[in-house]
């Protein structure tokens, strides 16, 4: 994971440490990345990111990650427009204020995008079921093309739009950005 995050930084992207580690493992990865970025005088030192869920320990995990050097928290769930995401976003925003950037998602409708922004998300991952490995659309019967979701959401709120899923070619990246996504 360290190598992937560093490669993402080097390519101008954002490497997010996934949430399927223990908090201790996540913190060790974050510290490793921070040390490497510090040693190389990288400007990405302020872009260290890690994912969390919405389970009962989400705030404890978020606090630990921020203490380890995380500047960006990503609430990573398959469908982000539900009460646990609302509770998590509001709690994180109240606890951290503006000193932590919060990304949440995934959603596919203007209403959901607006709600996540209103609940405190700085960035919202747009797209459900478009990824090559994603089974959400099949399992839930819910999903829509990422490009259409971006077009529908782009004028609904001020949070950054992050196109997530359904991006397979460089042309898909260009289309997502042209449609209103702030990042892919």
Stretches with model-predicted labels:
Residues 2-164, 168-183:
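Alpha/beta enzyme core
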